[in-house]
């Protein structure tokens, strides 16, 4: 996926009220932009750090700018716009990049399912059945490791999705969780048990129930981002 129009650059001043950020562009313009990420963004919002943002020409938008990429203290790039993950996964699915899920004949997005009335990101239909696919965007990295982690904040919603997937798997339905690691320089991903032990426990229960866990990394520049490789999933002791 190419960023269109081209992204603009700036420096982060502060993120606040979760969905807002003040930045200074390279031309010296002070802007308040939208932050499309509900997480803590633990290594992606360093004051003074470089950011890239898109600008909309839609006159109805209150904030024309949207934060897209951060440079982390480790020098990595992170696509912090969580809304991009599903687009990237759909592109990769249609291009056959995600080999474990090849062969589908139809793809549907945002399908209602489960006892807790969740909406799954994708339903893929095959000649012999179907599967449900949930996608999580990962941006949490560490200075001393090439292993990313999820989540970066406590996520009851994420645990609910795992319970729903586990229920499907127990009923004989193929259920898949895919971590889209939107962070450069990463070789694997793991559950962030130190941040959300309840999520880590729910993930283990989902795996035991038969949920398939996949992880894929991206090629990311300020010009484009796309899924390009399979990553390992590491489990805490």
UniProtKB/Swiss-Prot annotation:
GO MF annotation terms: DNA binding
Domain of life here? Bacteria
The record's InterPro entries line, in alphabetical order, gives: SfsA, SfsA_C, SfsA_N
Q: Which CDD domains match?
A: SfsA-like_bacterial
What PANTHER family does the annotation carry? Answer: SUGAR FERMENTATION STIMULATION PROTEIN A (PTHR30545:SF2)
Under HAMAP family, the record lists: SfsA
Quote the NCBIfam families the UniProt record gives. Answer: sfsA
Q: Which family does it belong to?
A: Belongs to the SfsA family.
What's the name of the protein? Answer: Sugar fermentation stimulation protein homolog
Source organism of the structure: Pseudomonas syringae pv. tomato (strain ATCC BAA-871 / DC3000)
